[in-house]
């Protein structure tokens, strides 16, 4: 029996070795670089980095930004969550798609759109000359908070809406029967029941804000607002390069994120309510007066205009402008910038090819490795399986820039053994490490719906493990594999921070091409690439949803 168990655990052990090499070693290298100097333990450089007034100010900036983004995203999402869960607006499923557009839009593209719209003599002032001077209001901390909140509020909206849908209407009706008005029901009923879900959503938004690089690097730098990610990036890329400071700041950021995850787990266990049971629960739409309905429509349209309309209008119109000096003047529009990307601009075409190659390769490797990981964990009964699964999901808990710094340090250290650093191979490896959790989660979700009796039936009828895997398991989990592949492809195609840190010399991808053109003044060409990037990602997502819906029907 022990011999059989060892054979069953062998794939798990091999995967454990691979994951430790790919994930744990780079993370460990960050902490080692922060405290080991010249081969001996030395905390003084790390302490000096943390006590540096500029770094202390930067840490304060990051925490302040995280809190403000949580507050503003809550103010935006809470009314929408109530409308889409308790009123007639819940019938309009199209809003579920529309309000995911800001979240699916790359943050650096959205922030560029806002910069083009709000800058001096920008698109807003061309449309409304009376708005001159408004750039002084936007290019502040408030503008940065607004742009980042417009990116993450759909996540908060989804969390709150799903939580509200689980609150039985009978509880609200009971409150009304006992004389509680709308405000009292919100205060005494909804808020306590939502506190656990809201805390989880707020902590996740906070961590995502701390981990975000795209918006702080484009808009934050313009207002001189430095945060964790931009400082870590600067220490790792701008001379004099200081990997020690970069590793120290990365360690602090990891510590904050892990504390947030621990706090989330604590809240989940202490502040959760069992609102869904075997007993049926009906949903009753709250009636709305004509004035309230008009106000609700106005709010929904306003949020969509600000979150989707402004950045997309700016990006698309700028990509079509012939001469920037003439702006939105009639006759000043052309598609020449799109034609240039596919004909004259060799770097643009090369960036597209590189992005497609990296996205396809990393998505395929993630699909294979993630599926093998889930299969090995499910098959094994060893205590090691929980550890291996946790390692596979670890990249999701850590900021992407931290993992990339760790990969840089680790693979640079072993360059003489494995000369992968400074090649396209290191980019593929980094993408695989960053996006492996997507496949693991989607395949695991598919596995939870498979009854063990199916496997047992296959064994009873003489099926070998390979036959059962090929004819039973894989057909049942292929949707999860396909979903994980597509999500990895979409996110890898537009990834910015990894490409900006470890791309080989003179190698551009879509994201770095857009940023470079934007910063060097070829804004229209950069925005043309941004439009193609968004169209590519959106089309892939729509294809994915169509395939999933068709399979559900069959």
Residue ranges of model-derived segments:
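Glycine/proline-centered hinge or cleavage motifs at structural transition points of membrane proteins
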Residues: 178-180, 192, 461-462, 475
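Short cytosolic juxtamembrane segments of multi-pass membrane proteins
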Residues: 171, 272-284, 454, 463, ...
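Peri-membrane helix termini and adjoining interfacial loops of integral membrane proteins
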Residues: 34-45, 119-130, 221-230, 271-280, ...
């Amino acid at each position: 029996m022990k011999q059989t168990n060892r054979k069953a655990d062998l794939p798990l052990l091999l995967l454990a070795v691979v994951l430790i090499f790919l994930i744990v070693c780079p993370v460990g290298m960050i902490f080692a670089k922060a405290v080991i100097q010249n081969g001996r333990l030395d905390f003084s450089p790390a302490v000096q980095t943390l006590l540096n007034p500029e770094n202390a100010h930067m840490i304060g900036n990051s925490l302040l930004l995280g809190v403000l983004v949580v507050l503003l995203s809550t103010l935006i999402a809470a009314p929408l969550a109530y409308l889409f869960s308790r009123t007639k607006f819940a019938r309009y499923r199209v809003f579920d798609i529309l309000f995911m557009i800001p979240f699916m839009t790359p943050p650096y593209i959205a922030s560029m759109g806002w910069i083009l719209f709000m800058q001096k003599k920008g698109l807003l002032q061309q449309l409304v000359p009376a708005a001159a001077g408004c750039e002084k209001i936007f290019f502040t901390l408030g503008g940065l908070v607004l742009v980042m909140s417009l990116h993450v509020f759909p996540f908060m909206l989804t969390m709150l809406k799903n939580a509200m849908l689980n609150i039985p209407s009978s509880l609200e009706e009971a409150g009304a029967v006992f004389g509680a008005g709308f405000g009292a029901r919100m205060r005494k009923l909804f808020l306590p029941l939502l506190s656990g879900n809201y805390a989880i959503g707020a902590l996740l938004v906070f961590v995502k804000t701390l981990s975000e690089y795209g918006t702080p690097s484009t808009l934050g730098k313009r207002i001189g607002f430095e945060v964790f990610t931009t400082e870590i990036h600067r220490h790792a890329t701008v001379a004099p390069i200081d990997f020690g400071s970069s590793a120290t700041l990365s360690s602090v950021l990891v510590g904050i994120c892990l504390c947030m995850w621990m706090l989330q787990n604590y809240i989940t266990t202490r502040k959760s309510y069992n609102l869904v049971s075997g007993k049926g629960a009906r949903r009753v739409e709250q009636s709305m007066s004509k004035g309230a309905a008009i106000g609700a429509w106005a709010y929904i349209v306003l949020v969509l205009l600000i979150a989707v309309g402004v950045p997309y209008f700016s990006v698309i119109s700028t990509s079509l402008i012939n001469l920037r000096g003439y702006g939105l003047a009639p006759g000043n529009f052309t598609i020449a910038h799109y034609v240039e990307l596919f004909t004259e601009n060799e770097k643009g075409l090369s960036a597209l090819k590189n992005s497609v190659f990296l996205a396809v390769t990393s998505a395929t490797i993630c699909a294979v490795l993630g599926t093998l990981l889930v299969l090995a964990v499910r098959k094994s009964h060893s205590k090691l399986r929980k550890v291996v699964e946790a390692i596979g999901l670890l990249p999701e808990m850590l900021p992407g820039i931290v993992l990339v710094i760790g990969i840089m340090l680790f693979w640079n250290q072993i360059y003489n053994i494995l000369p992968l650093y400074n090649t396209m191979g290191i980019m593929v490896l980094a993408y695989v490490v960053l996006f492996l959790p997507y496949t693991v989660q989607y395949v695991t979700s598919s596995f939870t719906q498979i009854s063990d009796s199916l496997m047992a039936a296959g064994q009873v009828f003489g099926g070998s493990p390979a036959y059962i895997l090929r004819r039973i398991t894989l057909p049942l989990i292929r949707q999860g594999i396909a979903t994980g592949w597509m999500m990895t492809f979409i996110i890898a195609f537009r990834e910015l921070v990894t490409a900006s840190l470890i791309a080989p010399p003179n190698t551009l991808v879509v994201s770095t091409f857009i940023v470079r053109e934007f910063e060097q003044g070829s804004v229209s060409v950069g925005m043309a690439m941004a439009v193609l990037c968004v169209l590519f990602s959106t089309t892939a997502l729509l294809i994915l949803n169509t395939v999933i819906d068709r399979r559900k029907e069959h």
